[in-house]
Amino acid sequence: MMKVRKILFACIIGGVLFIFLLLKYNPRNNRAYLENRIGTEVSRVYPTQNLEDLFEQFPNGFIVYQAHLMNENIVKIKLTGAEKGAPIKGELIETERKSGENTRVVSVEYYNGKYTFSDEKAASELWPQQSFLFQKITLNKDFLSTLKLKDKYYSSMNGSFELNYDVNLPETNEYLSFPASKTIELSFGGSNSNRNYYYSVVVEDKDGYYFRETVYE
């Protein structure tokens, strides 16, 4: 009986060690692979000045989503491009973080290169940029390779992956109304489990600020 237990214990330890080595030394968990994977895909969107041009990449339609913290609230905008030639529509929503209650909801429409809002005043307060980050910056694998890498992650279990950088990017800082010299954490995430395009760009800082932009089919 004791011999059987020793064999079982050895098998368990061996299995755990195998999984650890698989995760630690997965060939996909390296900077070059992840930057090629992420950079190649996000360059399809960053930059795109006219939202209607996204139909060139996603002829079956797309969704663009953005969220950022504003005081004690979170502001989200989600637009859906359902059909080429038709207006791209959605909502701009302010939500109290504690209660989860929507305090302001603004209808948004993008057509012929222009945003229109059901409440222009509220829109200018909640979304002063009145543009998405992908309309302002260029991202690709060559650019990512020049940044200071903070961390990387790849999961063999579900195929999710992430890259985190410490950066000072004047264009991004200007878009977020940050000081030009501010250092931010810039992250990119995706997953092999998503058959269609689904990538997020996240900006955070040491003071707890959070910004996320996601484009997906």
What are these regions (language model features)?
Residues A67-E72, R97, N168-P170, V202-Y210:
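Hydrophobic lipid-interacting interfaces of membrane-associated proteins
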Residues K78-S131:
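An acidic-aromatic
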Residues N140-S191:
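Extended beta-strand-rich segments in extracellular/periplasmic secretory proteins, especially
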Residues K6-M70:
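N-terminal leader/targeting segments and the immediate start of mature chains
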Residues M1-V4:
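Short, Lys/Arg-rich N-terminal segment immediately upstream of the first membrane anchor
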Residues D53-E56, I77-K84, V108-E109, L147-S156, ...:
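Short, exposed beta-strand/loop patches in secreted or surface proteins that constitute
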Residues K182-E217:
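Acidic, serine/threonine-rich low-complexity disordered tracts
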Residues L54-E83, I88-I93:
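N-terminal Sec/ER secretory leader and immediately downstream segment
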